A protein has these predicted regions:
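PRPP-associated nucleotide enzymes
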Residues: 1-251
Length: 251
């Protein structure tokens, strides 16, 4: 069948199936179209992808969201990168707004993998030359990839929206645990508000189990903004919200 040709060095955008409306909106903003991709799953769960036009010499951006089942969508993006490389794209940028396995960025105990590093290695092996992500769980993930990493922050847009919607006079930024203090502090500086911290303990042998110990900072009568980079089961945010209400937070 006939294959469309792509101009050399042309910027092209390809989308995985996890959340195609996101890639479509990006393409519309850039006044371009998505590269047509055929993708489907075999009966045993294997994924197949194929680009339906020439991508030789292009500057490609492969966009994939990573909701559940995350392993499925990660594998699809890896296959898309590999197919793009084998089709002679000049440069391939992986766009992963939520970076898969980002929370597994270090060993908590012996005999554990560093899964975030493995994911960056897989992208490199597949043919990626650059990675773009938003609000990485920890900044050191940028150093895992052997190539440029664009670490984007949603804070400027979100902070302006929060300030315009709720105001800042009665606002307190709250870190739901000690690991998010640095990010919450940046938010507090941006909004010009006080900072509070929820101290918690997490059992390393029981995933998603959270116990709140105490709150550092004044929250009574305040509008509290909880800042976190990832909500999975919602246990951390829910426990923090309950603790804030129990300590007199207004909303």
């Amino acid at each position: 069948m006939p294959v469309e040709k792509a101009a050399s060095k042309q910027l092209v955008i390809a989308s995985g199936r996890a959340h195609q409306p996101l890639a479509q909106e990006v393409a519309e903003i850039l006044n371009t179209e998505l590269v047509p991709v055929t993708a489907y799953d075999f009966a045993n769960g294997e994924t197949f992808v194929r680009y339906e036009r020439s991508v030789r010499g292009v500057d490609a951006f492969i966009i994939q969201a990573h909701p559940a089942p995350i392993n499925h969508w990660l594998m699809e993006q890896l296959l898309m990168v590999d197919a793009m490389k084998r089709a002679s794209a000049k440069r391939i940028t992986v766009v992963a707004p939520f970076f898969p396995y980002a929370r597994q960025d270090k060993k908590h105990k012996g005999r554990e993998p560093i899964s975030a590093r493995l994911v960056t290695d897989l992208f490199k092996a597949a043919g990626a030359t650059r990675i773009m992500s938003v609000d990485l769980h920890t900044p050191q993930i940028q150093g895992f990839f052997d190539g440029p990493v664009d670490h984007l922050w949603a804070l400027p847009l979100l902070a302006d929206h929060i300030a315009a919607t709720f105001g800042t006079e009665n606002l307190t930024v709250v870190s739901p645990d000690s690991g998010r203090v640095r990010v919450a502090d940046i938010w507090a500086d941006r909004l010009g508000t006080p900072l509070a911290i929820v101290h918690k303990r997490r059992d390393p042998d029981r995933p998603n189990q959270v116990q709140v110990n105490e709150i550092v900072g004044g929250v009574a009568g305040r509008d509290c903004l909880l800042v976190d980079d990832m909500i999975d089961t919602g246990g951390t945010i829910l426990a923090a919200a309950k603790a804030l209400k129990a300590n007199g937070a207004k909303r």
